[in-house]
A protein has these predicted regions:
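C-terminal peripheral helix-coil segments that are non-catalytic and often amphipathic
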Residues: 68-75, 112-124, 139-144, 155-181
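Amphipathic alpha-helical segments used for helix-helix packing
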Residues: 64-65, 78-102
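Membrane-interface starts of transmembrane alpha-helices
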Residues: 80, 130, 134-138
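Alpha-helical structural segments
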Residues: 4, 18, 35-58, 64-75, ...
Length: 181
């Protein structure tokens, strides 16, 4: 419901109907919409962002790490199509409603830390040039991941996403550039 209507548009009544519960049942566990919303954000971040980072850290190369992270998002979205739209919506809502943003479980902040680590690690292993501007590259990769999340959530389907992710991977690895052109 939050991914469809946003924080302001979602009501307890609509959430209860969608969850096949009564409004009092939801109010028993969550005394406010803010508490419910923050719990959904926490669970979604754990399911997608934390698991994506955990899987990505097992890979050895930067592109493999990004691919693993994206694969977790794709799997979660194929199992529950509201996941990607909700993650995108949560980022927007945290800008509209700063009181909903909590740094310890902010998907953008957590992803940014991971990407800075991954870029630094790629430099240390000689995969990237030593003079790489880490914050700029990490932020660029964050933009790519947010774009992929937006596309997965609102525009593409699972099959399209697999092809797009493979093309993105090849693009970032330089597979499309003509040598000497």
């Amino acid at each position: 419901m939050f991914s469809e209507r946003g924080y302001d548009g979602a009501t307890f009544q609509e959430i209860a109907v969608r969850a096949d519960l009564t409004r009092p049942a939801i109010n028993h566990y969550f005394s406010s919409k803010k508490l419910l919303y923050c719990d959904v954000v926490d669970q979604t971040n754990e399911l997608v962002v934390a698991n994506g980072i955990q899987n990505a850290k097992r890979a050895l190369r930067l592109m493999d790490r990004l691919s693993e992270f994206i694969a977790v998002v794709m799997r979660a979205s194929s199992e529950d199509p509201s996941v990607s739209p909700f993650l995108v919506t949560a980022v927007l809502e945290s800008q509209r409603h700063p009181e909903l943003s909590r740094n310890e479980n902010d998907a953008v902040a957590i992803s940014r830390v991971f990407l800075n680590w991954a870029v630094n690690d790629a430099i240390e292993r000689g995969e990237l040039k030593a003079d790489t501007d880490v914050p700029s590259l990490a932020e660029t990769l964050l933009i790519v991941l947010v774009g992929v999340g937006f596309y997965a959530g609102y525009l593409g389907n699972y099959q399209e996403m697999r092809a797009v992710i493979e093309t993105l991977r090849r693009l970032l690895e330089g597979a499309f550039w003509e040598r000497g052109a």
